[in-house]
């Protein structure tokens, strides 16, 4: 009997069952080494080959040019909130931030602790339910980079466009959207993403950075573990990388190719999100706060018109195998995350349950 459930959690997220089974089969004896992937030294030929293969697969999926470095770094994506200003801001520089949700707000405050940052737009007063109007902002002349979060995981808000910066490097936190939709790498100076949404398990952060941003490092000297140039020169092997995460990521990259690539997954993701939003818009029992033009494809936030029924909703959903639908602690409410590994069957099961719950409790 298959005991797998539909995990709608914002991260760690659902992984394809076939990848989990492959990892299970290989766990005790990886590539006939007689060792688990967890036991093999990170400077062995096997692991160096694994990292090289993972990087090449990611480059193929995203069409990453040669003048960009791909880094596989250990730790939380939140570390990048500090690494970015430390590496990219020189004395006298400013950084510009779009504050469109909780994560971009945190990144802005971290940058301000370390260096000098200002915000181009803040949607907080309206409750983080919208995106700033296209190109209605003005950059300071000393702006070293522009930072934005294309998809706000907590608030369920998505940029429907890529901000124009007039040649100033664009930095993007793509933790919850990298590999879910096509992007043009050349539009960005730096992209980073925590792995626990669409890439692998928690503990790995992928960084894609243009080589020009590694030059003219600011003073004082950046600590070596927080220095992008150092990690690039050592090909992500300056310290022990999160090998198992990279192993799963490599499998995920290959899996994406079998799903029609990123374009194929994007079409599927759009259909999944559209189906759930269509249901939400058809009933007064559920409320969706985000403006339609700013709705996330990955993270669908909603609430009940009777908030006191929320615990009952979650308990009954759990019994039906619909897990992790509780919203973030900062926002409350409910949230269904529809990452790459979530099948349409999961969306159908959720809508069926929500419809039944509304009829019984409306």
Curated annotation (Swiss-Prot):
Pyridoxal 5'-phosphate binds at residues 77-78, 103, 153, 173, 196. It catalyses: O-phospho-L-serine + 2-oxoglutarate = 3-phosphooxypyruvate + L-glutamate; 4-(phosphooxy)-L-threonine + 2-oxoglutarate = (R)-3-hydroxy-2-oxo-4-phosphooxybutanoate + L-glutamate. Pathway: Amino-acid biosynthesis; L-serine biosynthesis; L-serine from 3-phospho-D-glycerate: step 2/3; Cofactor biosynthesis; pyridoxine 5'-phosphate biosynthesis; pyridoxine 5'-phosphate from D-erythrose 4-phosphate: step 3/5. It comes from the Bacteria. One of its GO terms (molecular function) is O-phospho-L-serine:2-oxoglutarate aminotransferase activity. Binds 1 pyridoxal phosphate per subunit. GO terms for cellular component: cytoplasm. InterPro entries: Aminotrans_V_dom, Aminotrans_V_PyrdxlP_BS, Pser_aminoTfrase, PyrdxlP-dep_Trfase, PyrdxlP-dep_Trfase_major, PyrdxlP-dep_Trfase_small. Its cofactor is pyridoxal 5'-phosphate. Pfam families: Aminotran_5 (PF00266). L-glutamate binds at residue 43. The modification N6-(pyridoxal phosphate)lysine is found at residue 197. Keywords: Amino-acid biosynthesis, Aminotransferase, Cytoplasm, Pyridoxal phosphate, Pyridoxine biosynthesis, Serine biosynthesis, Transferase. Its main location: cytoplasm. It is found in: Cytoplasm. One of its GO terms (biological process) is L-serine biosynthetic process. Catalyzes the reversible conversion of 3-phosphohydroxypyruvate to phosphoserine and of 3-hydroxy-2-oxo-4-phosphonooxybutanoate to phosphohydroxythreonine. This is Phosphoserine aminotransferase. The gene is serC.
């Amino acid at each position: 009997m298959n005991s797998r459930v539909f995990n709608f959690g914002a991260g760690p997220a659902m992984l394809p069952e076939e990848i989990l089974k492959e990892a299970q089969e290989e766990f005790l004896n990886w590539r006939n080494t007689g060792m688990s992937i967890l036991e093999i030294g990170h400077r062995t030929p096997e692991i160096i080959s694994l990292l090289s293969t993972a990087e090449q697969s990611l480059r193929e999926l995203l069409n990453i040019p040669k003048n960009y470095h791909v880094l596989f770094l250990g730790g939380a994506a939140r570390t990048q909130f500090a690494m970015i200003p430390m590496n990219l801001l020189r004395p006298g520089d400013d950084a510009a931030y779009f504050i469109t949700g909780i994560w971009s707000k945190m990144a802005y405050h971290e940058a301000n602790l370390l260096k000098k940052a200002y915000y181009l737009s803040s949607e907080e007063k309206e409750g983080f339910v919208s995106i700033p109007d296209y190109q209605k902002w003005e950059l300071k002349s000393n702006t070293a980079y522009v930072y934005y979060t294309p998809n706000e995981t907590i608030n369920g808000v998505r940029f429907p466009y890529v901000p124009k910066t007039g040649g100033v490097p664009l930095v993007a936190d793509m933790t919850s959207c990298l590999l879910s939709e096509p992007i043009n790498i050349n539009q960005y100076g730096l992209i980073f993403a925590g792995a626990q949404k669409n890439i692998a398990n928690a503990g790995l952060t992928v960084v894609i950075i243009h080589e020009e941003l590694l030059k003219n490092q600011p003073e004082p000297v950046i600590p070596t573990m927080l220095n992008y140039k150092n990690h690039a020169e050592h090909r992500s092997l300056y310290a022990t990388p999160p090998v198992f995460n990279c192993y799963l990521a490599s499998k995920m990259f290959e899996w994406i190719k079998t799903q029609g690539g990123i374009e194929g997954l994007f079409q599927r993701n759009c259909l999944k999100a559209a189906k759930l939003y269509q249901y939400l818009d058809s009933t007064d029992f559920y409320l969706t706060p985000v403006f339609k033009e700013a709705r996330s494809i990955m993270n669908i936030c909603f609430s009940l018109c009777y908030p006191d029924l929320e615990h009952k909703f979650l308990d009954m959903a759990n019994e039906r195998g619909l897990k992790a639908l509780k919203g973030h602690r900062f926002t409350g409410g409910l949230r269904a995350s529809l990452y790459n590994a979530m099948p349409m069957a999961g969306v159908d099961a959720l809508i069926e349950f929500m419809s039944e719950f509304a009829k019984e409790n409306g």
